[in-house]
Amino acid sequence: MTKRNKIIYWIATIWLTLGMTSTGVGQIIEMKEGSGAVNSMVHLGYPLYLLTIIGVLKILGVIAVLIPKYPLIKEWAYSGFVFLMVGALYSHVAINDNPKELFGPALLLILTLLSWYFRPVERKINVVNL
């Protein structure tokens, strides 16, 4: 892995984990305002019990991405982040929400893809052709 790729990986991963942690904690404690918070979920038409589920999954995903071992669990975490952000983007588009509401999920989706693509070899799954 080149130094450039390592820098890209860590910058994307740090910003991704900060974003997922902050929104995840906000969802767990059911903040009224903010990205993915109570007012946002009500606006999108989702039940509030999803806040706790999504918040806990985000925190678990952050832990999986940051720990150095368990590449299969990392892959699941990255795919979960992609599913969450694609779902968030679609939800905002489906209700004809203000385009500025797409920025947060789009940024986290891009950071997820960058972190996944530039992850070090030791954090990838070894694939064996049969």
Model-derived features: positions:
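Membrane-interface extramembranous regions
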Residues: M1-L130
